[in-house]
Amino acid sequence: MIKQFYAILFFLSMQACIGIFPLDTQAQSNTNRDTINVRSGNKTSTGFWIHDKTREINISRIGPFIQMKKDVMATVDTSNFLVSTDEGLTWKAFPLFKDSSKFFIRPERALIKTKKGTLILAFANDKERAKWNWSKDTHDSPEAELPTYAMYSKDSGKSWSQPQLLHKEWTGAIRDIIETKDGQVVFSSMMMRHNPGHHAVVTYNSADEGKTWTRSNIIDLGGVGDHDGVTESTLEQMKDGSLKMLLRTNWGYFWQTSSTNNGLSWKNLKSTPIDASSSPGMFKRLKSGRLVLVWNRYYPQGKKSYPLRGGDYNFSAAPVSMHREEISIMFSDDDGKNWSQPVVIGKTTEPKTQIAYPYLFEKSPGELWISFAFSKLRMALYEKDFVQ
């Protein structure tokens, strides 16, 4: 009876979406065969095929990366702020926490250096992961906790503020952070919702260099499942000053929402024409002014099908592609109204491997370093080689 009830809810929600999906947004494919020959082309030392206009980079850390000053870059690991002066070959560690036994930073995190030089880190604390007990009968884990925190440094990462708890609800992932033109910092997080269990997205805004934070409205489109709802968003500021955020969904496309008050509230929620598997993308403004998007498409290039997962109201209500065998890139000159043709820049060559959860770092103007939270692939490319 419960499953029938949820099935009706899912059907009604999908009916509400009819008309939102443009007819030309269906995942495009003219063949049903893999169009990338991994037996030829470039291979990385970790076994991935990469586009011939990209190169492998020798860097062990996953990111996210920031530029501290010329020839100095930084990132974090589970408990340290890390600084490199040799393009990531070696790292000097500075402890983030006075008591590291209480904190463990998850791989999905966000780090930024503001225009005033403040370092801000947002993360979910795995040390406080608790009470996860998903029920296949009620389709929920109502007491689950995985808190969101933020902290800052005023001395280039040598010392850090006490982590500030922003919410205790289960945080599926923290994926992105930006500074707006007027100096406000906004990062995206997640918050689990219940009855039934599913995920939602929230953002936090700071107008004082990370000292205090204001939470946005909760972006909740419903869902039923421990991987359902809207999740793992990436955001950027548009030329008109508004913010745009792309949301991972299980509905075949990124959805988007916009804010005209620096992420304090979000509205105009709708589907985009960008087909996407159930995986997060990374959406960034480059020094050139272009936008770039790195993500996993719904199908492998050249194919019309892919094994689906979910549809059981425990993983998700709708069956969905979890395609993570390829990573693609595209660019926009007009704030995402139009995009260049997607190009596959990386592909797995071994079973049970993936390329997913990208971090994007513009190492120098037009030079993009791409790393992944859940893949050993590390690669670099030049913007000029992929735009006309």
Tell what function each PLM region has:
Residues 1-4:
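Positively charged n-region of N-terminal signal peptides that target proteins for export
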Residues 7-19:
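Bacterial N-terminal signal peptides
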Residues 17-28:
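Signal peptide processing junction and immediate N-terminal pro/mature segment
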Residues 28-388:
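Asp-box/BNR beta-propeller blade signature and adjacent active/binding-site loops
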